[in-house]
Regions:
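Glycine-rich ATP-binding loops of the HATPase_c
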Residues: 128-136, 140-141
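Acidic ATP/Mg2+-coordinating residue in the GHKL
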Residues: 85
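Short conserved segment of the HATPase_c
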Residues: 90-102
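Short beta-strand/loop element within the Bergerat-fold HATPase_c
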Residues: 67-77
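Conserved short strand/loop->alpha-helix "switch" segment adjacent to the catalytic nucleotide/phosphoryl-transfer site
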Residues: 25-49
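Short beta-to-alpha transition helix within the HATPase_c
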Residues: 1-20
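Conserved glycine-/histidine-rich ATP-lid loop and adjacent helix of the Bergerat-fold HATPase_c
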Residues: 120-129
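Conserved ATP-binding N-box helix of the HATPase_c
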Residues: 42-65
Length: 151
């Protein structure tokens, strides 16, 4: 995988998924060089974005045989992070609400403890003029794309 912070995050999330009975797969094309000049996010931002995306995906896996698939790569000088899961996904309106601080799909839980993850993801992505999108295929797919640094 290359980038040490990404390796540590993926190892930790893999262990969490295993404890929860979720099949977490890292795609074969996942790779980020450890050369920070090529990556548009600093490691802490990458952990915030990808960590929250994976957490949300694991929480959304409500089908039998739950799974999450993670892909991270540099494509055309842009950082592309994609997390797919076996959950039902969100329509466009719900996804837009989920990017607002305080909104949570996790019913019955303390509101002050939820509704921050996707808002933080969106904040980091917007700060770097990136794009955060969601699609529903067999499950849900959330993609964060951050353009490369100029210069």
């Amino acid at each position: 995988v290359g980038e040490p912070a990404l390796v540590a995050l993926l190892l930790g999330k893999s262990a969490q998924a295993d404890e929860r009975g979720i099949a977490l797969t890292i795609t074969e094309d996942t790779y980020l060089p450890s050369d920070a000049d090529n990556v548009p996010l600093i490691p802490q931002e990458m952990i915030t974005v990808l960590g929250n995306m994976i957490d949300n995906a694991m929480d959304a896996c409500d089908r039998e045989d739950p799974w999450v698939e993670v892909s991270v790569s540099l494509q055309d000088h842009a950082l592309l992070m994609r997390v797919a899961d076996s959950g039902t996904g969100m329509d466009a309106a719900e996804f837009a609400r989920a990017m607002q601080r305080g909104y949570s799909t996790k019913a019955g839980r303390e509101p002050e403890q939820h509704g921050l993850g996707l808002a933080l993801v969106a904040q980091v992505i917007r700060r770097h003029d990136g794009e955060l999108t969601a699609d529903v295929t067999y499950g849900s797919v959330v993609t964060a794309c951050v353009p490369g640094r100029a210069g």
